[in-house]
Amino acid sequence: MEKIIFDKIYNKNCLDGMKLIDKNKIDLIITDPPFAINFKAKKANYNRKDSNVIEGYNEILPEDYYQFSYDWISESNRILKESGSMYIFSGWNNLKDILIAIDNVGLTVVNHIIWKYQFGVVTKNKFVTSHYHCIYVCKNPKKRKFYSFSRYGKNEKSDDGHSLHYRDKEDVWEIKREYWTGEDKTPTKLPAEIIKKILLYSSKKHDIVFDPFLGSGQVAVVGKMLDRHFCGFEIVKEYYNFAQKRLRKNEYRLNKKN
């Protein structure tokens, strides 16, 4: 049987790959699973040129989304340590299936975080969606790790006199999207600032961080930058190659000259 090595990523279906990881092995999972919303991955918007967007984005059929969610969340629960946590990002369209799967698997919801970003997609006959959901869950509430003062000290203040520690721990995060103009990119990626924030609050150096839907490799790349061990699976060969190249070159952004 193939052995999964950490500090390495794999071009593999995560449902197959996670079965090769021992139970109670992973400290932290951060992931943004595929959509089921007819997402137009090649659309040239927000300064994104079609020619720079790597093809291959995979979606899940809406009628299959609950079972898909249950399957990968169940495996995630198996490989998480008792002290481990998971952050699942989702649009509102797929949120119901994910929340039901979390309950049925037996994980505990710690927080429901809102990522508020700038510039939602323009709409005609409904309100503009300009946020994303992040469900923070844990395996064992009594053993869950959370490093409360990893980013700001208890008495650190902003210029206007407010507590930076309190503000940073609020459950609405206003963090800008990253736009890689003129550079190769995948259609979706979480900003490095979000991943750094999660890594600092829910892991420490040399912990093992895992992403079952690696995409462009953000979780692995940022995890490596912060001295975490990493692992992840990406089923799309083009995305895997892109992520592998970023890790190999130790470069956050790649352009066509690289």
Q: What label would you give each PLM region?
A:
Residues E2-N241, R248-N250:
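Core catalytic lobe of class I
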Residues Q244-N258:
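Class I S-adenosyl-L-methionine-dependent methyltransferase module
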